[in-house]
Amino acid sequence: MVYPYRVLCYSKTNILSFSASYQLPEAAIHTFCEQCQKSEYVQVKCVLTSTSLEKMVPLNLLSSDRTMLIGMYIQSLEIRDCGAPAANDIGKIQKIDDYGQFHTLWKAGKNFTVLPGIDSFVIIHNNFG
């Protein structure tokens, strides 16, 4: 089976995304998830997100996972949307909805939702001290 998805792997301190605009073989997804689990990531979850909003699937984040990510600071790399924060802008995750979208308050005071697996960003600081 092939998936036209991006793979998102996250832990307490980082989000790692393996993206492909083409269809991704199931074996490649499993290999990436195995690499995540062997790396420094402690609490790794591998999920699939679609590359198009019409096919976007919920991330199925557990309540504890959402709590873990709320309050983390992210830096935008590339967000493809009108009115999106500029590259390298910094924002704080305020909440995560049922579709796994990160509702973020950006440094300029603007609220903007980030879509993991579609938008590119990195976590630069977390709320664990």
Put a short name on every predicted segment.
Residues 16, 34-59:
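Short, mixed-charge low-complexity intrinsically disordered segments
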Residues 13-15, 52, 107-109:
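Glycine-centered tight beta-turn/hairpin loop motif at sheet-sheet or coil-to-beta transitions
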Residues 2, 6-7, 30-33, 43, ...:
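Mature extracytoplasmic/luminal segments of secretory-pathway proteins
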